[in-house]
């Protein structure tokens, strides 16, 4: 089914994003974050994030409509993040989308936030990184963010199966907790990646083993935080050595798990689809590109939560 003008709304966590697509191309994306507010708490406070979304949603929508040179009655379909996410935050987009859909007499379609991330490399904003033919099924979908770290079997847009996921902390969450302990500004992932030096990436031993038996990062996180607490005020503490050793350990472990999935699948996967906030990490991207499978990665502006990915995934479902 074809819809000329599609509105997208994303509000699953601390970002509020509005996007508009015309004729299957994203023409505007407006994303606003409340991360500066949450920085005082070292993490996202759901009630504060939801209130922030409510306060700026109308203004952000008007900005998007103005940039797209549209009036609101030109919208043919509304897409919004339905799950997963923070319930208070999800509620904002759901109520707004369904109310607006009722008033305009147009459909409102809820979209899975994680599947939006999986297909985010394929977002077409007039300067698409890849051709649709670059995505060959079956694909391996990878989501790595502050809330989720998971690996999926992607047979088609509507046939996605979870293969493996962390038992506890997502990688992005560990980055933020480590960054907070080091006094880095929230969210800390980008700063840690910026400080990363491969020549100093094996100088700190957080654990007595270089392998984790389970797909779990809570124990490793505790070990890193314990090391920081004991050493950060020492005169010989080296920040670059600490963050480089941390990043190499956790990304290498994740890459090994991806390799295990690929090997067990007997090389059936033709493409890797990478999405989520941590997908912008330079070391993760470089390691994935070393694999013998074509890896599709999103533009940095689409690696975090955004409404363009919600529209994009909805379009893939509609075009099946």
Curated annotation (Swiss-Prot):
Record-level Gene Ontology MF annotations: iron ion binding; N(6)-L-threonylcarbamoyladenine synthase activity
Primary residence: cytoplasm
Positions of Fe cation binding: 113, 117, 305
InterPro entries hit by this protein: ATPase_NBD (IPR043129), Gcp-like_dom (IPR000905), KAE1/TsaD (IPR017861), TsaD (IPR022450)
Manner of cofactor binding, per the entry note: Binds 1 Fe(2+) ion per subunit.
Entry's Gene Ontology BP terms: tRNA threonylcarbamoyladenosine modification
Top enzyme category: transferase
EC number: 2.3.1.234
Family to which this protein belongs: Belongs to the KAE1 / TsaD family.
Role according to the record: Required for the formation of a threonylcarbamoyl group on adenosine at position 37 (t(6)A37) in tRNAs that read codons beginning with adenine. Is involved in the transfer of the threonylcarbamoyl moiety of threonylcarbamoyl-AMP (TC-AMP) to the N6 group of A37, together with TsaE and TsaB. TsaD likely plays a direct catalytic role in this reaction.
Protein name as it appears in the record: tRNA N6-adenosine threonylcarbamoyltransferase
Species whose genome carries this gene: Mycoplasmoides gallisepticum (strain R(low / passage 15 / clone 2)) (Mycoplasma gallisepticum)
């Amino acid at each position: 089914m074809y819809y000329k003008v599609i509105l997208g709304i994303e509000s699953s966590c601390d970002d509020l994003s509005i996007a508009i697509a015309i004729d299957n191309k994203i023409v505007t994306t407006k994303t606003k974050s409340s991360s500066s507010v949450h920085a005082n708490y070292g993490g996202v406070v759901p009630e504060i994030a939801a209130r922030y979304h409510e306060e700026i949603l109308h203004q952000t929508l008007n900005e998007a409509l103005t940039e797209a040179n549209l009036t609101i009655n030109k919208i043919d379909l509304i897409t919004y993040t339905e799950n997963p996410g923070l319930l208070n935050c999800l509620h904002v987009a759901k109520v707004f989308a369904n109310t607006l859909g009722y008033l305009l007499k147009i459909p409102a379609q809820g979209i899975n936030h994680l599947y939006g991330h999986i297909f985010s490399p394929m977002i077409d904003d007039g300067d698409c990184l890849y051709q649709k033919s670059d995505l060959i099924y079956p694909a391996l979908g990878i989501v790595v963010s502050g809330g989720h770290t998971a690996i999926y079997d992607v047979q088609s847009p509507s046939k996605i199966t979870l293969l493996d996921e962390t038992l506890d902390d997502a990688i992005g969450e560990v980055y933020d907790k480590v960054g907070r302990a080091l006094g880095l500004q929230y969210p800390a992932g980008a700063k840690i990646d910026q400080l990363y030096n491969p020549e100093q990436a094996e100088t700190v031993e957080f654990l007595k083993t270089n392998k984790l038996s389970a797909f779990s990062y809570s124990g490793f996180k505790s070990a890193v935080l314990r090391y920081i607490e004991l050493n950060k005020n020492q005169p010989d503490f080296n920040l670059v050595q600490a963050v480089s050793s941390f990043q190499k350990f956790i990304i290498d472990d994740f890459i090994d798990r991806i390799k295990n999935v690929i090997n067990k699948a007997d090389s059936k996967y033709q493409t890797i689809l990478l999405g989520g906030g941590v997908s912008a990490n330079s070391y993760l991207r470089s390691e994935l590109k070393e694999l013998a499978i074509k890896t599709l990665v999103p533009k940095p502006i689409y690696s975090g939560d955004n409404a363009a990915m919600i529209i994009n995934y909805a379009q893939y479902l509609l075009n099946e």
